[in-house]
Structure formats: C-alpha cells, structure tokens
Amino acid sequence: MIVLGVDPGLTRCGVGVIEAGAYRRLSFIHVDVVRSDPHESQDLRLLKIYDGLCAKMDEFIPDTVSIERVFAQENRNTVLGTAQAAGMAMLAAAQRGIPVALHTPTESKMAITGNGKAEKIQMERMVARILNLNALPTPADAADALAIAICHALRPSGALEGGEREQHLTPAQRQWAQATQHATRRRGVRRGM
C-alpha cells in the first residue's frame, strides 16, 4: 500500500510518500515540500499548492492520502490558510478517487513514539529510524508529512487488516489503539449513547 502523507500549509505544504508492506515493513519513497510565495494573492497560492499536490498524486498514485487534521491555533490567519491547504489535498485526492484519512498530531505522535506529547526532535528521529533514513528528514514540514503517512500505515485499521493486524502490533500501537477505543467510549457516554 502506498500512502501519501500531507502536512498542510499555505507557504510550505509537506508531502511524504511511503510504502507499507507486510509485517509493518515501511519503505521510504519520496519527501518534498510544495511551496507558494507569501507575496502572491491567496487564490494563486492555493492554486500552486493544489497543482503541486496533484502532480505528486499523479506521480506516485497512492492508495490513500493521509492528511494532518487542522486544529484552531491562536493565529486565525495561519489556521485558515492551513485548513484551505488541507482542503486542496482532499479535493485533489477526491478527484482521483483516492481515499482520504485525517489524523491529529497527537495520533501521529502516539503511533510513532508511543507518546502523544512527543517533542518534534523525537518525532524526526523516530521517522528516520522507522524508514531507515541516514539523516533526519528536513524541513520540518517534510518530516511531519512522513509522520502522518507512517501514522496511517501503522494505525490498527490502516495497512494491516483482519487477524494479521492484531498479531503484528507493536506495544506502542497496542497502547494507541487502546487509548483510541477508550476515548471513543468516553465520548459515547458523554453524548448519552
């Protein structure tokens, strides 16, 4: 399974491509950053991001596009641009019939390090280790895109399906799956389900 990870951003949109094989074997394929000029109008910047993402999807033909879920930040303009870039990734994938998965930064950290509050350098080191890279992926947007792709490939309902899935989870993945199930049950209780 080929997973294309996207760390959305209006100025720098990270793109990471990995292959998920049997027994949680992940292989690095590609990493890049699609850039737009902050001095251009927002519509032209979004078009550059969209065109760049379309080109990557056409080149690597992923089975899934995994996008970092956008959360509200203090800077409203930043979150707006980030959300719009995420929308461009979703649109490009939908036009190609590619399934989209959204993952939070906490999910990504939990899947990769076993710690939902891991520091950026811990994430970068684990991404390099998981993908057997000789150096840390740079810039940060590129590393984050690879992390989102890895998160999707390693999640319990990602690349591994059925009985094989449970059998090959790492301790960190088991902990993450249990935490996700617990959080889902708690939300259901609060909503009166």
Swiss-Prot record:
Mg(2+) 1 binds at residues 7, 141. Mg(2+) 2 binds at residue 68. Keywords: Cytoplasm, DNA damage, DNA recombination, DNA repair, DNA-binding, Endonuclease, Hydrolase, Magnesium, Metal-binding, Nuclease. The active site is at residues 7, 68, 141. GO terms for biological process: DNA recombination; DNA repair. It comes from the Bacteria. The keyword Cytoplasm applies. Its cofactor is Mg(2+). It catalyses: Endonucleolytic cleavage at a junction such as a reciprocal single-stranded crossover between two homologous DNA duplexes (Holliday junction). Binds 2 Mg(2+) ion per subunit. Residues 183-193 have a biased composition (Basic residues). Its EC number is 3.1.21.10. Belongs to the RuvC family. The RuvA-RuvB-RuvC complex processes Holliday junction (HJ) DNA during genetic recombination and DNA repair. Endonuclease that resolves HJ intermediates. Cleaves cruciform DNA by making single-stranded nicks across the HJ at symmetrical positions within the homologous arms, yielding a 5'-phosphate and a 3'-hydroxyl group; requires a central core of homology in the junction. The consensus cleavage sequence is 5'-(A/T)TT(C/G)-3'. Cleavage occurs on the 3'-side of the TT dinucleotide at the point of strand exchange. Homodimer which binds Holliday junction (HJ) DNA. The HJ becomes 2-fold symmetrical on binding to RuvC with unstacked arms; it has a different conformation from HJ DNA in complex with RuvA. In the full resolvosome a probable DNA-RuvA(4)-RuvB(12)-RuvC(2) complex forms which resolves the HJ. This is Crossover junction endodeoxyribonuclease RuvC.
